[in-house]
């Protein structure tokens, strides 16, 4: 008996990510420095941890409602209203999820059907496509490499018209992984002017919204496209809480009434103690990202200076904590091969650009969510490698 042939056929479209393949290829290199992680190197603020401890001591160990604690939804509502001028009712327009990843899964499985198309500016975070594929839908990438990784209204409308009636949604992630680019209010208004002409969902992955470096606050498309937008956010990046798995969905009540169905049968509810910690994070800790941002800016600028001097082309990222650098001419443009050789010779790991789709080939992504000491040593070894290659 061979039951493997009876698995969901959509799984055949899903492969182990190139990130994991690359990690496995270099995993046995002793003492390797990793600038690969998509999570803060900072620890969760002490006052947030104390709130979780209090919840445990008070025996807050039972299920919450499917939507999450009302106190948390109120805190989240106040937070996004103050920070981003978003207006979502805590009673019926906010869902608490197990990380932004579950928020995305619940959203995409709720809105997509077999044969649907989803537009995605590329290069892009590789986690969207497997979810889309599992429901029998298809990602259609929009190449942004010739425009500084920024989606323009013209590019967007052209892609919308090409897909026709099968187009169900657009995913827009900003500040973006892997490029670190973000959008100004004017750029978003121009995109919104296109999007509101079409009956499609706009899924906004804004999990890096607290990590912007322009001096201006993050602008959410939810302020412009309330009747179309589903906003995904979370506390992993803003409060260094990746392991707590706490995400949020903000959407109109008519949307959440449907989204809660997929959320409920995926997970029932988010972790209760983590929810109590999140209340503290979004109230007393609403500015906890500020010290991290100062460190990230210093690290970003140091890396850009060093890599630019070595011939890498870099569009300065205005958010998140990634550098997406084009491999200089004259070197191996196969990002996997280039970085595998670099790792083997100098014991430093970045992520191949090809891990972020075909439009990422020829680039490397490195995370500056690492100590300055680690970054300086990595840049020193990179300089040696480029000189010797």
Where are these regions (language model features)?
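Conserved N-terminal alpha-helix of the aminotransferase class I/II PLP-enzyme fold
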Residues: 64-98
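A short acidic, glycine-rich active-site loop
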Residues: 59-63
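PLP-dependent class I/II
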Residues: 1-7, 12-15, 20, 25-29, ...
């Amino acid at each position: 008996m061979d039951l493997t042939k009876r698995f969901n056929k959509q799984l055949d479209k899903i492969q182990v990510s190139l990130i994991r393949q690359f990690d496995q290829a270099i995993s046995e290199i002793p003492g390797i420095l990793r600038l690969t992680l998509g999570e803060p190197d900072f620890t969760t603020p002490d006052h947030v941890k104390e709130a979780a401890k209090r919840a445990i001591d008070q025996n807050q160990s039972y299920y919450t409602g499917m939507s999450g604690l009302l106190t948390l939804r109120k805190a989240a509502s106040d937070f996004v209203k103050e920070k981003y001028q978003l207006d979502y009712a805590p009673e019926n327009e906010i869902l608490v999820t197990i990380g932004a990843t579950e928020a995305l899964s619940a959203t995409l499985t709720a809105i997509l059907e077999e044969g649907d198309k989803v537009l995605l500016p590329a290069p892009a975070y590789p986690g969207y496509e497997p979810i889309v594929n599992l429901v029998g839908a298809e990602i259609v990438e929009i190449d942004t490499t010739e425009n500084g990784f920024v989606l323009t209204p013209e590019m967007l409308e052209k892609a919308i018209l090409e897909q026709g009636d099968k187009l169900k949604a657009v995913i827009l992630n900003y500040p973006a992984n892997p490029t670190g680019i973000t959008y100004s209010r004017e750029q978003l208004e121009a995109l919104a002017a296109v999007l509101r002409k079409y009956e499609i969902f706009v899924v906004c992955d804004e999990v890096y919204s607290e990590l912007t470096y322009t001096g201006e606050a993050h602008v959410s498309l939810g302020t412009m496209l309330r009747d179309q937008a589903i906003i995904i956010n979370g506390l992993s990046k803003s409060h260094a809480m990746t392991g707590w798995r706490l995400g949020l969905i903000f959407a109109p009540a008519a949307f959440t009434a449907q989204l809660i169905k997929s959320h409920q049968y995926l997970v029932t509810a988010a972790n209760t103690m983590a929810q109590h910690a999140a209340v503290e994070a979004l109230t007393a800790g609403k500015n906890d990202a500020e010290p991290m941002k100062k460190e990230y800016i210093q690290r970003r600028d140091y890396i850009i200076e060093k890599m630019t001097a070595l011939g890498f082309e870099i569009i300065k990222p205005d958010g998140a904590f990634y550098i997406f650098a084009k491999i200089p001419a004259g070197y191996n443009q196969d990002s996997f091969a280039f970085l595998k050789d670099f790792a083997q010779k100098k014991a430093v790991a970045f992520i191949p650009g090809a891990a972020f789709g075909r439009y990422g080939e020829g680039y490397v992504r490195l995370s500056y969510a690492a100590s300055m000491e680690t970054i300086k040593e990595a840049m020193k070894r990179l300089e040696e490698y480029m000189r010797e290659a």
